[in-house]
């Protein structure tokens, strides 16, 4: 069977080496004669797995010791509510920076749950020559006392990424669901980082939360116990039965990333992949991207065809040659190629070849 390259925005493709290892030991994990899905989450073998997973993630992201690493339920949307309930209290105030669909969704959830607390927001995307561009505000000029400022450095739907470090006088809460471990960041700049697993970590159903000690002293609201960061810390992410298979696969992805040189190594590859695809788009008038170069997402490349009536043919012909899940999000349409860590350079090269051939066949210059 020829190679299939899966450009899905999430759940996304996993590293082939990880999938093969999971396949090989699916029925007999660690010589126990049973699957990892069948062992107790409190057994010594699984506890050892969780400890190694945390150690590997700390090493990969250079996480300081005054941060807790949590493996939680709920995905990114679950964290939208968890952040509010854990940090805002009854009289708190928070600022949300809006750059696209996911930061808008986080804002909407905060507004729904805030009660007597105050939620402020700033739209940080402007049009520059008809292209979307991020303009980060000078937060130090805002006269307010916020518990936290929330932002999403990469908008998967809109194809917008913020590469500049956010400078804030208040704790930063960041949704890194689509960029975690794709490039190096300074974790110490953040009060809390959260990420749904289904893009760069593993299968859906698991969220990673990296939270600084002092954030856990902020007033909280009544909430579900399984989304309480303090309880998660107290119980080593096992207040209730965790998604064990997702945790296992995340551990394998961390080990795989370490084996290929870590985040610094994959960051170079990710940059190459994105540059290759954007070069194709820019060189061919048949394709267009609506984001300024400085804010083009490395993880989620969005583009439109010059003739949208050919969208169906593009997707059908791409799938026929093993390039799948290229349809853009229903909100914005067009195409989207998600280039997460597991996508090899060969997959992007195959997509570029197809795009050039498709344009030559359908576009009259």
From Swiss-Prot:
GO molecular function, one term: O-phospho-L-serine:2-oxoglutarate aminotransferase activity
Entry-linked Pfam families: Aminotran_5
Protein name according to UniProt: Phosphoserine aminotransferase
Lineage: Bacteria, Pseudomonadati, Pseudomonadota, Gammaproteobacteria, Alteromonadales
GO biological process: L-serine biosynthetic process; pyridoxine biosynthetic process
Name of the top EC class for this enzyme: transferase
Pathway(s): Amino-acid biosynthesis; L-serine biosynthesis; L-serine from 3-phospho-D-glycerate: step 2/3; Cofactor biosynthesis; pyridoxine 5'-phosphate biosynthesis; pyridoxine 5'-phosphate from D-erythrose 4-phosphate: step 3/5
The protein's role, per its UniProt record: Catalyzes the reversible conversion of 3-phosphohydroxypyruvate to phosphoserine and of 3-hydroxy-2-oxo-4-phosphonooxybutanoate to phosphohydroxythreonine.
Assembly mode: Homodimer.
CC cofactor: pyridoxal 5'-phosphate
Keyword field: Amino-acid biosynthesis, Aminotransferase, Cytoplasm, Pyridoxal phosphate, Pyridoxine biosynthesis, Serine biosynthesis, Transferase
Residues where N6-(pyridoxal phosphate)lysine is found: 199
Cofactor binding summary note: Binds 1 pyridoxal phosphate per subunit.
The organism of origin for this protein: Shewanella oneidensis (strain ATCC 700550 / JCM 31522 / CIP 106686 / LMG 19005 / NCIMB 14063 / MR-1)
EC number per UniProt: 2.6.1.52
Catalyzed reactions: O-phospho-L-serine + 2-oxoglutarate = 3-phosphooxypyruvate + L-glutamate; 4-(phosphooxy)-L-threonine + 2-oxoglutarate = (R)-3-hydroxy-2-oxo-4-phosphooxybutanoate + L-glutamate
NCBIfam families membership: PRK05355.1 (NF003764), serC_1 (TIGR01364)
Sites where the protein binds L-glutamate: 42
Family: Belongs to the class-V pyridoxal-phosphate-dependent aminotransferase family. SerC subfamily.
SUPFAM superfamilies, per database record: PLP-dependent transferases
Residues bound to pyridoxal 5'-phosphate: 76-77, 102, 156, 175, 198, 240-241
Any single GO CC term annotated in Swiss-Prot or TrEMBL for this entry: cytoplasm
Annotated InterPro entries: Aminotrans_V_dom, Aminotrans_V_PyrdxlP_BS, Pser_aminoTfrase, PyrdxlP-dep_Trfase, PyrdxlP-dep_Trfase_major, PyrdxlP-dep_Trfase_small
Compartments, record wording: Cytoplasm
Main location: cytoplasm
